[in-house]
C-alpha cells in the first residue's frame, strides 16, 4: 500500500537576509512524505527566489501531479523542475534505503567579517579550519581588507569566498589588491567572481586566487573540463535536480581532480539534514557548505543536531492532500 502527503510551510527569516538585491522575509517551501508498506521517506521542495528558474507555484503543481500518479501505483518520471525532482528523489531514496543515514554535520561557518566571532566558531570545529565569507555585497576594497584581516589573524584558516558574479574585472582586481599575496593560497576558492566566465578565468590567472564554478554549472553549454585556476565545483542540489544528477556532477568533478562541495540553497532544517547525509555519502573528504539554518527563526520536522532554534513538527505544516 502506498500513501502520500504534501505539506506547505513558511518560516520567518532573520531581518538581514538579502538575495540578489531583494530582502527575503520568509522561506517558503513544500515537503513530500511518501509511505509504502512500513517504510517512509521525506523530501523538501523549496525553490530559492532569485536563483531557481521555477516559482514555488510551478514546483507545487509538478509535485502534486507526480504524487497523485505515484500513490495509485504508477511509476511516474521525475518532474523536469529541479527543486521538485530533487525533493521527490530524496523521498524515494529514503523510502528504498539508498540515502545513507550517516551525515556530515560539520559546516563551514558563514562569517560576517568579525575575527573574534570566527575564532569562537572555529575553536569548536574539529580538523580543518574552513570558513565562508560572502563578498560583493559591499565595496570590493572593504571585502579585500576583511579577507586579509581574517587570514592574518588566524594562520591555519582556509577561506571559501562567494561573490555571486557581483564584480566587474576592475572591482575584482581592487579586491585582490588588498589581499596579501602570501595569504592567497589559503583562499580555498572564490566562487564566480565576475559576471562572465572568461573574466573570472582571467582574474584567477592574474591574481593566483583559485576560483570555483557555481551558477555556471546550471547554464546551457557548461562543460566539465579541467581549467587552470579552477579548483572546485559548488553543487546546490535544490537548483540542480534529482539525486542522480547530483551524483553525476560530483563524479564528473572528482574525475577532473576538482573538489565538489555540496551547498545549501537556504533549505529548512529537514532539507539541510538531508544535504548533510548526501555530503557524507558523495563528498566524504569535503566540508559541505550548509551553515544557513541560523538565517531562519525555526526548525521543521527534523532537527539539526545541537542547534538551539525552536522546533516545529508536522502539526505546524499545511497538508495539501
UniProtKB/Swiss-Prot annotation:
What does the record give under GO molecular function? magnesium ion binding; O-succinylbenzoate synthase activity
> What's the top EC group for this one?
lyase
Which residues are listed for Mg(2+) binding in this entry? 162, 191, 214
| Chemical reaction(s) catalysed | (1R,6R)-6-hydroxy-2-succinyl-cyclohexa-2,4-diene-1-carboxylate = 2-succinylbenzoate + H2O
Q: What is its EC number?
A: 4.2.1.113
What GO biological process terms are annotated to this protein in UniProt?
Answer: menaquinone biosynthetic process
Pathway noted in the entry: Quinol/quinone metabolism; 1,4-dihydroxy-2-naphthoate biosynthesis; 1,4-dihydroxy-2-naphthoate from chorismate: step 4/7; Quinol/quinone metabolism; menaquinone biosynthesis
Q: Which InterPro entries match?
A: Enolase-like_C_sf (IPR036849), Enolase-like_N (IPR029017), Enolase_C-like (IPR029065), Mandelate_racemase_C (IPR013342), OSB_synthase_MenC1 (IPR010196), OSBS_N (IPR041338)
| Annotated SUPFAM superfamilies | Enolase C-terminal domain-like, Enolase N-terminal domain-like
The residues annotated as the active site are: 134 (proton donor), 236 (proton acceptor)
Q: Indicate the family of this protein.
A: Belongs to the mandelate racemase/muconate lactonizing enzyme family. MenC type 1 subfamily.
Job of this protein: Converts 2-succinyl-6-hydroxy-2,4-cyclohexadiene-1-carboxylate (SHCHC) to 2-succinylbenzoate (OSB).
UniProt-recorded name of the protein = o-succinylbenzoate synthase
User: From which source organism is this entry?
Assistant: Enterobacter sp. (strain 638)
Write the lineage as a comma-separated list: Bacteria, Pseudomonadati, Pseudomonadota, Gammaproteobacteria, Enterobacterales
Amino acid at each position: 500500500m502506498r500513501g502520500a502527503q504534501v505539506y506547505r510551510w513558511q518560516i520567518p527569516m532573520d531581518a538581514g537576509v538579502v538575495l540578489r538585491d531583494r530582502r527575503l522575509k520568509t522561506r517558503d517551501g513544500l515537503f513530500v512524505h511518501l509511505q509504502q508498506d512500513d517504510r517512509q521517506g521525506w523530501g523538501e521542495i523549496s525553490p530559492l527566489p532569485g536563483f531557481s528558474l521555477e516559482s514555488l507555484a510551478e514546483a507545487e503543481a509538478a509535485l502534486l501531479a507526480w504524487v497523485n500518479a505515484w500513490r495509485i501505483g504508477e511509476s511516474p518520471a521525475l518532474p523536469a523542475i529541479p527543486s521538485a525532482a530533487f525533493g521527490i528523489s530524496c523521498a524515494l531514496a529514503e523510502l528504498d534505503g539508498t540515502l545513507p543515514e550517516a551525515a556530515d554535520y560539520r559546516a563551514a561557518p558563514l562569517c560576517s567579517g568579525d575575527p573574534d566571532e570566527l575564532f569562537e566558531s572555529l575553536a569548536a570545529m574539529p580538523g580543518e579550519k574552513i570558513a565562508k565569507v560572502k563578498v560583493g555585497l559591499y565595496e570590493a576594497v572593504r571585502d579585500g581588507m576583511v579577507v586579509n584581516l581574517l587570514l592574518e589573524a588566524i594562520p591555519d584558516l582556509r577561506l571559501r569566498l562567494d561573490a555571486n558574479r557581483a564584480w566587474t574585472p576592475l572591482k575584482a582586481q581592487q579586491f585582490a589588491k588588498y589581499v596579501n599575496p602570501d595569504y592567497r593560497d589559503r583562499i580555498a576558492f572564490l566562487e564566480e567572481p565576475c559576471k562572465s566566465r572568461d573574466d573570472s578565468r582571467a582574474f584567477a590567472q592574474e591574481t593566483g586566487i583559485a576560483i570555483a564554478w557555481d551558477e555556471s554549472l546550471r547554464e546551457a553549454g557548461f562543460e566539465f573540463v579541467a581549467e587552470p585556476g579552477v579548483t572546485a565545483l559548488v553543487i546546490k542540489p535544490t537548483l540542480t535536480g534529482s539525486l542522480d544528477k547530483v551524483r553525476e556532477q560530483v563524479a564528473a568533478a572528482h574525475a577532473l581532480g576538482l573538489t565538489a562541495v555540496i551547498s545549501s540553497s537556504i533549505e529548512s532544517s529537514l532539507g539541510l539534514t538531508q544535504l548533510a547525509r548526501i555530503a557524507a555519502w558523495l563528498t566524504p573528504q569535503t566540508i559541505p557548505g550548509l551553515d544557513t539554518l541560523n538565517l531562519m527563526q525555526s526548525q521543521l520536522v527534523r532537527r539539526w543536531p545541537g542547534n538551539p532554534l525552536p522546533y516545529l513538527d508536522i502539526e505546524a505544516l499545511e497538508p495539501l492532500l
